[in-house]
């Protein structure tokens, strides 16, 4: 089924949650997060949210490569 990658950034951490849609219902495949280093803590919101997307794509590359998927973020500019 189709994959959905949810990402988020805060000053302290980035997170990524991978879901897979099966029969119209999303099921969590894996959760992941990491703390931000001192440079990442200085990012503006757009840079931070993009960092979270890149983190999620790298973390779940093996699941997503060659698949149709959607990225969901709470930052409207992205």
Describe each model-derived feature in a short phrase.
Residues 8-12, 74:
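A short acidic Gly-Thr/Ser loop motif
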Residues 2, 13, 24-28, 68:
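Conserved catalytic motifs of the protein kinase core domain
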Residues 11-20:
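Acidic, metal-ligating active-site segments
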Residues 19, 54-78:
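RNase H catalytic domain
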Residues 1-9:
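Two-metal-ion RNase H-like nuclease active-site motif
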